[in-house]
Amino acid sequence: MAAKQLAFDVEARRALEKGVSTVAQAVKVTLGPKGRNVVLERKFGSPVITKDGVTVAKEIELKDPYENMGAQLCREVASKTNDVAGDGTTTATVLAQAIMLEGLKNVAAGANPIFVKKGIDRAVETVVDEIKKISIPVESKESIAHVASIAANEREIGELIADAMEKVGKDGVITVEESKGTATTVEVVEGMEFDRGYVSPYFVTNTEAMEAEFEEPYILIHEKKISAINDLLPLLEKVVRTGKPLVIIAEDIEGEALATLVVNKLRGTLNCAAVKAPGFGDRRKAMMEDIAILTGGTFLSEDLGVKLENVDLNMLGRAKKVKIAKEKTTIVEGYGKKEAVDGRIAQIKKQIEETDSDYDREKLQERLAKLAGGVAVIRVGAATETELKEKKHRVEDALAATRAAVEEGIVPGGGATLVHAIPAVEKIQAEGDEAVGVRIVRRALEEPLRQIAANAGLEGSVIVERVRSEQPGIGFDAVKEEYVDMIKAGIVDPAKVTRSALQNAASIASMLLTTEAIIAEIPKEEKAPAMPPGGGMDY
């Protein structure tokens, strides 16, 4: 085991503070509409230019192991806020630094860190209640576009996100991809789409697009392979009598079963197609159950104990339209009962809440979207690769912030909400060192607005005092450099972002205040390579 070095008390806290401040200094210049850029070196390719707090924070690694611990904790504030709310990383970093610096001053002067922490927690709770009280629900397309435009710093992106959300609903999946051209567009896949196509090209009905399209088909959803035609014949005869097409989704269709389907299709006896089931293992089973619920059919699994030859028409699913391409299948407007689909959606949402795995969560979100109404793809275009990366990042940020706004509503932006929460904090009854903790938060609430003003080249203290004296909801528009009603001016933040930023900042800062010792590995000294043995020079 490598030897460790230790630091205690004031020395420990000072080292951590230095690390936090280093990260905060780099991150906070990006805050606000007039935030400055940070350029990040890349070993390969062009440098990255960004205004995104969490990207800057993740780049920073310090040489001193103690200071690096502080830097990592500061990174944690930014990334945690980003994970929960998708935005507010810079605000969280500014708040964490403010709470920590004020707190360390007081602890060094003899305040008890435990009571200081208690005061900080009480003040944060009060501010969170204030945020919840004043938050305004986001429902209209226009207000969604507003929120997204602010997060992305661009109206066009805001409109695209609002467009995508309107089309796929609040639970729909919206993915961000790089476009081949320079334009940024939204593409919507309606209905349920999965990445499996027809088993044989003979099933194609539209030779130009190489797709099989069926109106109001019956859909057989079978867990196992189908190879014997005798199992399938009774069902085929029933479907032929109805004159409707048949789509078979199974693990695989092969041998004489496939040959018979192809022959019937070519003769015009039965319009049909076979598709392999999507996914693998347990996920395949779950996806096929989803398809069954969406189409109002029965998933014919082994557990059900129903043989293929005994399948009735009422066990088959139905849909308004099914489109099958070489590598994807889309089921539009399944005829499943709304209550059954809603029940399945609620079940998947519960699984999303309970899972710890990011991968599982992503896959569950995809399943949820497919049931809830579709998937939208925002294709981001730009003139250069550097611009493309930066723009794609902004779109992803704006998307997460917009989801947060739809979830918990919006509050006045630009740091105004935190400043207007100060009177509520001042009313808290606290004594001794607990009152010190409350005062620390009260002072920290001014910092985001102060920093926004500083980045715009103005005097922060003057602006903070002016906003404090105004009615709640009035804040400072750093672009126009005037005092406005923030909601009317469209300068808003998702309530979830403001709340998460404060809670995460206070959590890390108060943890640092109560730190009494830090342990790190002793850095290895790199020895200079030995000189090669000299042998004189050869000429």
Curated annotation (Swiss-Prot):
Highest taxon of source: Bacteria
Q: Which GO terms describe its cellular component?
A: cytoplasm
| Keyword field contains NADP | no
Pfam families associated with the record: Cpn60_TCP1
- Grouped into one coarse class, the protein's main location is cytoplasm
Which GO terms fall under molecular function for this chain's record? ATP binding; ATP-dependent protein folding chaperone; isomerase activity; unfolded protein binding
Assigned EC number: 5.6.1.7
Which UniProt keywords are present, listed alphabetically?
ATP-binding, Chaperone, Cytoplasm, Isomerase, Nucleotide-binding
Compartment(s) of residence: Cytoplasm
- Annotated binding of ATP, by residue: 30-33, 51, 87-91, 414, 477-479, 493
- Say if the entry is tagged with keyword ATP-binding: yes
State the family it belongs to: Belongs to the chaperonin (HSP60) family.
Its job = Together with its co-chaperonin GroES, plays an essential role in assisting protein folding. The GroEL-GroES system forms a nano-cage that allows encapsulation of the non-native substrate proteins and provides a physical environment optimized to promote and accelerate protein folding.
Summary of subunit composition and partner proteins: Forms a cylinder of 14 subunits composed of two heptameric rings stacked back-to-back. Interacts with the co-chaperonin GroES.
Q: What is this protein called?
A: Chaperonin GroEL 1
Instruction: Please report the organism this UniProt entry assigns to the protein.
Output: Moorella thermoacetica (strain ATCC 39073 / JCM 9320)
> What would be the name of the gene that encodes this protein?
groEL1
